[in-house]
């Protein structure tokens, strides 16, 4: 009999290790559901911000399961989603941020600083903005210290700036001021990375507006009974 290889298919059922099965089930349950039939999945709805425009039944199909999952997902499933891949990590970070599970602050901060995958940084920055404590400001500032000088990289600098400005607005602090000063690190990064005609859209006040919109929308959600 031919040897079964990990990841092979027998009767269309993947052969997995127990750990892989846990991750697969978590992805299927939390990452793949979609509120809109035209959507590629929850992760795509969160990434695109399309949910901000949802109305009526589509809005309910998006919000109710999302809020229920954010309040009920186990630590084991969150760890499974955070294990690898931008889609699961993005979704996990949103669930963490919605429920304000601050016990994951250090983990999300480490993932943000490592910047191993694309797109997931949106979720990390959203969650840290939702937490809005001095510790979150420190993490976001550390990210900007590391990546704003890297004008060869276009990662999550704008998202981190928006999140830090949002935290400042909540705490009455000015952690972002050194970065947003004229000629500061943020302006130099934007000037080096962004085309001149697009730079107004990356202004600090625009990044704050974008993050505030996400957090205000989340603040308006209620946990389903």
For each feature predicted by the language model, list its residue ranges.
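Extended amphipathic alpha-helical repeat scaffolds
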Residues: 134, 144-145, 151-159, 163, ...
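Structural detector for internal amphipathic alpha-helices that build alpha-solenoid repeat scaffolds
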Residues: 49, 53, 57-69, 90-100, ...
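Alpha-helical transmembrane segments with an aromatic anchor "belt"
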Residues: 95, 110-117
